[in-house]
Amino acid sequence: MGKNHLECRECKKEYEPTFKYICDECFGPLDVKYDFPSVNKNTFKDREQTYWRYFELLPISDKNNIVSIEAGMTPLVKAEKLGKELGLNNLYIKNDSVNPTFSFKDRPAGVAISKAKELGLTAVGCASTGNLASATAAHAAAAGLPCHVFAPSDIEMAKIAQALSYGANYIAVDGTYDDANRIAAQIGDSKGIGVVNINMRSHYVEGSKTFSYEVAEQLDWQVP
């Protein structure tokens, strides 16, 4: 199946990597599974200062499909005073607020939209009330893909202003976030839209793990 495939967490049925996220047999969630290449800590030396330095450990097969806005490799700061207050000698804080859209959501959104590009999808979106909308819209703009943000109709517009500035289309849903999530899932599946935190979720969650890879590397691979 190539570099990676999808596997049902419950019954272990395997699938080609698509924007399928639920098993046809048992309705269990699908996870990305890798045919890991031979890598070690030296593999990642002298690479770009983004989370894409860990390309071999992410679910994109062709580097030409990477959609990057230079997120990742954020500062790891030793919190001396707070650590002393808490009785901890080695307390570190990972500052993902310096990512391009100011949150860790740039990691999963970037991986999901890169996969959407690799799969040939022509539009992406998300159900969000804030940070994810911004991250999805920014990456969609970089990829040249239309972006649809599903959010409650009574949301404070300031929460999605950044997403709108990137050209996102706001779809107002009467009801709660759960209602917006449900509508996003229905429209995404029926229209072939890659909704990053729903039908692209299997790939989306893979981006978050780069946080821990960076922490390990920034500690010279000597984790507490």
What are these regions (language model features)?
Residues 1-224:
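PLP-dependent amino-acid enzyme catalytic core
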